[in-house]
Every structure is written in structure tokens, then in C-alpha cells.
């Protein structure tokens, strides 16, 4: 009995480990299948854009181009047809000949130009974002400019004081300019001279009075 008991307990251990290994292998296989390359629609659009035929690319010519790129055409034949139909329905490809997947296909220039414009807009937005990141550096320069602005008022105060001294000195010049007023008053003196000159005219009759007195004395003596 003692020999059979350990055999029963040891048997379940490998049964529990085996399912975990199977799950990991399945996940790894699924990851490998997903990472096989770009989708069929991208390969078809590249092949059609590379062709220089004006009438468009036929289905057999498209398969040859895909096979040259290393794509397995025989296994993915149904995917190629579905990809062509979806691209025609979206408007990226235009079917010039035939119906369905059979026929010739060409790139839609309007759709291609519409896809190119959003890319240009994205690049413009990226360029606009770069200056936005560069702008915070400018405020640092302005901070330096503020320091220079603070220093300048000290220099400005000195010329202001010098200007005040000059203004204080200017009244002396004004006093010197005021002196000619005294010189202007001097012409009033000739008026006084004129008055003196007029006085002798008044004094002349006074000088005549003594003569009259002398005449009176002479008359009295004669009497």
C-alpha cells in the first residue's frame, strides 16, 4: 500500500504543466502570422502607382508585380480580389475596364491628392509646434532686458540733476538780460534836459522885469 500511494500523487503533476506549454506555442504562432508584413491593399496601391500604363493595370499584371515583391499570389488570390473591390469602393482605385475583380485598375488622382494634403497640414502643424516650444526661451532674454531697464534710470537721474543746475544758472543770465532795462531808462534824461531848455524861455520874461524897474527908477529921477 505504501508503494502505490506515491505513484498516484506524482501522476497529476505533468498533466497540469502540459496545457500551459500548448497555450504559449499557440500565442507565438498567432503573433508570427500577424507580423507577416503590410496588408494587401497597401501592396496593390503601390503596384498600381508604380505602373506607367495609361489604360490601367490588369489583374494578371498586378499579380506579377505582387509576386515580384515576394507576395504569395496563389495562396492569397481571394484576398487580392477582395482588396481590389474594397479599394474601388473607397475611391482610391478606379476600374477602367471590366467588372468586379477582373479588369484593369488605375489610381484615383483626386483621392491621392486629398491624402497628400492632410500630410502637408500635419507637417505644418509640427512646424508650428516647434516655435511654441522655442518661445519660452525668449522670456529669459526679456528678464535680462528688465535688469538693463532698471539700471538705466540711475543714469537718467544724473542728466536730470545737471539739467536742474543749468536751469538754476540760467536766472543769472536773465538778470544780466534785465540790466539793459536800466539803459533803456536812461533815454528819459534827455526829457529832463528838454525841460531845462524850456525853462530859459520862461526866464527871459523875468530878465525883462529888471529893465522895467530900471526904467521906473529913471522916470522917478527925472521927476
Swiss-Prot record:
GO cellular component: heterochromatin; nucleolus; nucleoplasm; nucleosome
Protein name: Histone H1.5
Citrulline modification, residue list: 54
GO molecular function annotation: chromatin DNA binding; DNA binding; histone deacetylase binding; structural constituent of chromatin
The encoding gene: H1-5
Protein function: Histone H1 protein binds to linker DNA between nucleosomes forming the macromolecular structure known as the chromatin fiber. Histones H1 are necessary for the condensation of nucleosome chains into higher-order structured fibers. Also acts as a regulator of individual gene transcription through chromatin remodeling, nucleosome spacing and DNA methylation.
Domain H15, residue spans: 36-109
Cross-referenced SMART domains: H15 (SM00526)
Assigned protein family: Belongs to the histone H1/H5 family.
Residues carrying N6-acetyllysine: 17, 46, 75, 165
